[in-house]
A protein has these predicted regions:
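Multi-pass membrane proteins that catalyze or facilitate reactions on polyprenyl-/lipid-phosphate substrates
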Residues: 1-277
Length: 277
């Protein structure tokens, strides 16, 4: 992999990790188009770039959540967990993010081999699920924005968001797309649905990073420059994608992403069937 290819793949990873168009599908597509196969080390650093982008963007919220969550552990010891839980929205939200992460964790543990088999299959699999992503986005935009936000979100909404994220382990289903759609269906405010989706991605991306980093050892490339440039590209593109999505979801519909997913899904599906790709 040369430097230009590394930067292109890094940009694609960063953008599609947070835009509702499926990073898994686009990484498969772009690597087929470029005729390259990324190494484990490269993939690991792409995930690290995306992870740092969302951590840096929401750094103020993340710090408050961590401090509040640690405080809630102290509340448990001192027998005032319920009071602290109801008084501090950051304590509640930290626990709700943990709750919402359980479904994807269970799917990852028990169905990892089955999912890996789908990723190694023909391109029509992610193409099909990309079309499904478009349909989910389109239907979700027909819903009226709810009034559930950071201050009144509960376990039911959080778990539903988590189930949406668990479904997105399938190649071609957008993680941000399914979680935002799940939030809108369950009655979340549009802006909060997007914010919850992005913060919820942190444990998922961190989990993927840790699973890869434990095997990275001897797989480290001798040429480290493409890895570093891909990492930087993923970080910058990821940060920009989060900022754009939060602005876009307040002002406009996400239908444009639905149309895009349909178009790309159909083109790649037909191309795969015809053995063009």
């Amino acid at each position: 992999m040369n430097i230009i290819q590394a930067i292109i793949i890094g940009v694609v990873q960063g953008l599609t990790e947070f835009l509702p168009v499926s990073s898994s599908a686009h990484l498969v597509f772009i690597q087929n188009i470029l005729g390259v196969e990324s190494s484990l080390a490269f993939d690991t650093f792409l995930h690290l770039g995306s992870l740092l982008a969302v951590l840096w963007f929401f750094r103020a919220d993340i710090i408050k959540m961590i401090v509040s969550w640690i405080s809630s552990l102290s509340d448990i010891v001192h027998g005032r967990f319920k009071e602290g839980f109801h008084e501090d929205p950051y304590k509640r939200f930290a626990w709700y993010v943990i709750l919402a992460t359980i479904p994807v964790g269970l799917v990852g543990v028990f169905f990892e081999d089955s999912v890996d088999a789908l990723f190694s299959g023909a391109l029509y699999v992610p193409a099909f699920f990309l079309f499904v992503t478009g349909t989910i986005l389109y239907l979700s935009q027909r819903m009226t924005s709810g009034n559930i936000n950071f201050h009144n979100v509960g376990p039911k909404e959080s778990l539903f968001m988590g189930l949406g994220q668990a479904c997105a382990i399938l190649p071609g289903l957008s993680r941000s797309g399914t979680t935002i759609a799940a939030g809108l269906v369950i009655g979340l405010d549009k802006e909060f649905a997007a914010k919850f989706s992005f913060i919820l991605s942190i444990p998922a991306i961190l989990g993927a990073f840790l699973l890869q980093v434990k095997d990275i050892g001897s797989a480290m490339d001798a040429n480290f420059l493409p890895i570093i440039l891909g990492f930087i590209a993923a970080f910058i593109a990821g940060y920009a994608a989060i900022k754009w999505m939060l602005e876009l979801i307040q002002k406009r519909s996400l239908d444009i992403f639905a149309y895009y997913c349909w178009a790309v899904g159909i083109i790649v599906f037909m191309g795969s069937i015809a053995h063009i790709f």
